[in-house]
A protein has these predicted regions:
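Bacterial N-terminal signal peptides that target proteins for export
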Residues: 1-9
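Bacterial N-terminal signal peptides
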Residues: 9-20
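Catalytic domains of lipid- and phosphate-ester/thioester hydrolases
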Residues: 21-517
Length: 517
């Protein structure tokens, strides 16, 4: 009897197997109805040059692109933004940070720009504090990171990752980075309104006047790798009508059938741009009238630097002459190019994944300067109208410095130390102690518990940093891995690195603020 049933089972299995194959019909590529993603354009929006002239020169279009790189990118670029505020124009209320017209951001770089613009809208315009004063005095009330950890091992458990958390990433971003506490509207330390694309993009027919820079988060279409710039006309053109956020229920974007793009929450753009496959859930949107979804992943898959969207924004700015279109690229790639040789050992899966992802990013970085210059020439913008700030800014400066005995001692200690975080903590402790001894406690700000905040070293002391100081700062910061969760020590070193790198470019950055007649 068992044999009989087993035989019947095998026959049914074979039949279903054959049927399954017979149902896999040929898909005709000639019948694919491809709808392209709307391109970057400023045609339907009021110009950012209409903002208050006290704070920005309407004759210069200044854009900043911030690359991806997880929390390393977030806090290094945050340090750069803090440093940009310290570059003031002569006889003016303007500074480089206020002059910025456009932000093009990718992945971790979205967090710093999103945080700054949220604070600019809700706090700085209402008070008389600088961004530096607010950031370092309100750090306890205003978190600027998502308390979520991830590792490369999550790549091996993608099914669990795709189910998402009880609280979606977009909700966490709103609460912890964009400061919108929808669960507790009486919270005095949080913003009462959600950041929407309408905060940055004002339609031409509106009676409102632009007062914020434009911020564009960049994502990548999962199915074909095409770049998606989160702008109102792009959202509307894609017929998005819902967000399939990775939680228990579909979260509608608004009450309309199709979102008009202006009421699109910024948090969705940032979430999509930072959705690194296998580490954070893919961001999925419902499309009106189609039994399909739009799945968006990390913007770094299509352009990890954000330069393409930024140059398209500058090119589309019809109010400013091409010779006065300027750009700053914040490059948050920490490690340098790896040597091609490895030890003769069995190649591990995790090492293979790491090397493959690094190669994908670095093949683009290898031609970065040439790509930028080619794009500038194509758009008829002078190739002298851009600067790059990154960890290489610190390294290049370090190479020119005079090396003394203390530098050689630190170099030897670094070379002989294991790449273990406990050792990095020891280097951090000594570095902090040496700076306080060297410059005095009054050169720093303290937190609410009276602890010195290392990242607040006053910028007029930067010229006095020694080669040994900068060596530790550079090596510590550039060794921070691309990850979500970050330690307080890593945060401090990244912020200080960003501020110092910006200071080292002061002359070049001031030239970008000079109007070409």
């Amino acid at each position: 009897m068992k044999y009989k049933y087993s035989k019947i089972f095998l026959i049914l299995y074979f039949f279903s197997f054959q049927l399954g194959f017979s149902q896999n019909k040929i898909s005709l590529f000639s019948e694919i109805n491809y709808n392209s993603i709307p391109p970057v354009s400023l045609n339907e929006y009021k110009s950012v040059q209409e903002r208050d002239k006290k704070f920005q020169n309407p004759n210069i279009a200044l854009g900043v692109a911030i690359s991806g790189g997880g929390s390393r990118a977030q806090f290094f670029s945050m340090g750069v933004l803090l440093g940009l505020e310290e570059i003031n124009e002569e006889n003016s209320q303007r500074n480089f940070l206020k002059e910025i017209d456009y932000f093009s951001t990718v992945s971790g770089g979205c967090y710093s720009a999103g945080y700054y613009l949220t604070i600019l809208k809700n706090k700085l315009y209402q008070g008389h504090q600088s961004f530096n004063e607010f950031y370092f005095s309100k750090a306890d009330a205003y978190k600027d990171y998502v308390n979520k950890s991830a590792s490369i091992l999550s790549l091996l458990n993608n099914n669990k990752n795709e189910k998402g958390d009880k609280i979606s990433m977009s909700q966490q971003l709103d609460l912890e980075v964009l400061q919108y506490d929808c669960t507790n509207p009486d919270n005095p330390d949080k913003c009462k309104t959600q950041m929407l694309l309408s905060d940055f993009f004002i339609p031409k027919e509106s009676t409102l006047r632009p007062y914020l820079p434009m911020m564009v988060a960049n994502g990548t279409a999962y199915n074909n790798g095409e770049r998606i710039a989160f702008m109102p006309h792009v959202i509307r053109g894609l017929n998005i009508n819902s967000s399939l956020a990775p939680n228990k229920a579909t979260v509608c974007l608004d009450e309309n059938e199709v979102n008009d793009g202006y009421e699109f929450p910024l948090t969705y753009g940032i979430t999509a741009s930072s959705a690194f496959p296998g580490v954070l859930p893919k961001t999925k949107f419902g499309i009106k009238g189609q039994n399909k979804i739009l799945c968006i992943i990390d913007g770094g898959a299509s352009d990890n630097t954000g330069y393409k969207t930024l140059l398209e924004l500058l090119h589309s700015d019809s109010k400013v002459n091409d010779k006065n279109k300027k750009a700053l690229f914040i490059d948050c790639l920490g490690q340098g190019k790896k040597e091609p040789y490895i030890t003769d050992e069995k190649i591990k899966l995790i090492s293979l994944l790491e090397t493959t992802s690094l190669y994908t990013v670095q093949t683009r970085y290898m031609t970065f300067d040439r790509d930028i210059e080619n794009a500038f020439e194509r758009y008829k913008i002078p190739v002298s109208n851009y600067q790059i700030i990154g960890f290489t800014t610190l390294r290049d400066h370090l190479l020119k410095m005079k090396k003394d005995e203390s530098y050689q001692t630190i170099m030897a200690e670094l070379k002989n130390a294991d790449d273990d975080y406990s050792n990095w903590l020891k280097f951090y402790g000594k570095f902090k102690h040496d700076l306080v001894e060297q410059f005095g406690e009054l050169s720093f700000t303290r937190d609410k518990d009276g602890e010195i905040i290392l990242a607040t070293l006053t910028h007029n002391k930067f010229n006095e940093l020694t080669a040994a100081n900068i060596l530790i700062l550079y090596e510590f910061a550039s060794h921070v891995e691309t990850k979500l969760k970050i330690t307080p020590e890593e945060r401090e070193m990244l912020l200080l690195s960003g501020r110092l790198a910006t200071f080292l470019k002061t002359k070049e950055l001031k030239n970008l603020l000079t109007e070409n007649k």
